[in-house]
């Protein structure tokens, strides 16, 4: 079975994403966000766009959304997804660093098994302000209106929080669900 690719967007938790997947016995490989899309398309069964400081340092990661593979965008990965598909991001009113209670508005294969409210770990200053056409807002919080969104037809999923951090309650379930999506 092909691995999942974790795209390194220069974020502080990207190696923790890789470590979490490997600890779960999910084959995964870290790649640069400058890896040519054709190479990515041949080598994996799904993509995790990791976090990072700015869209300007996201390399060619937005091109990976057009490969027909399932994609999970985490933090900056969510912002890459939103802007590449016609949405918008802005500086958050308060930003988020620490524990946040997220409310799930709509269930989805990525969020299968989670309760309607859950504790997650946030580490961001920007947020999605306009959800792209074809996407559904799945979750929000008191500090961030779009905590999760998805384009079910394209198998594109984005979350603002960090499931790889131990402070996110049951964060591994999200990776388990994404692995299942990539195995369908």
Curated annotation (Swiss-Prot):
Alphabetically ordered keywords of this record: ATP-binding, Glutamine amidotransferase, GMP biosynthesis, Ligase, Nucleotide-binding, Purine biosynthesis
CDD domains tied to this protein: GATase1_GMP_Synthase
SUPFAM superfamilies named in the record: Class I glutamine amidotransferase-like
InterPro entries on file: Class_I_gatase-like, GATASE, GMP_synth_GATase, GMP_synthase_A
Residues at the active site: 75, 162, 164
Residue stretches making up the Glutamine amidotransferase type-1 domain: 3-184
Coiled coil: none
Superkingdom, natural source: Archaea
Recorded catalytic activity of this chain's protein: XMP + L-glutamine + ATP + H2O = GMP + L-glutamate + AMP + diphosphate + 2 H(+)
GO cellular component terms listed in the entry, alphabetical order: cytosol
Membrane-spanning parts: none
A Pfam family assignment: GATase
GO MF annotation list: ATP binding; GMP synthase activity
EC number: 6.3.5.2
UniProt pathway annotation: Purine metabolism; GMP biosynthesis; GMP from XMP (L-Gln route): step 1/1
Function: Catalyzes the synthesis of GMP from XMP.
Family matches, as HAMAP family: GMP_synthase_A
Subunit structure: Heterodimer composed of a glutamine amidotransferase subunit (A) and a GMP-binding subunit (B).
Protein name stated in the entry: GMP synthase [glutamine-hydrolyzing] subunit A
Species this protein is from: Methanoculleus marisnigri (strain ATCC 35101 / DSM 1498 / JR1)
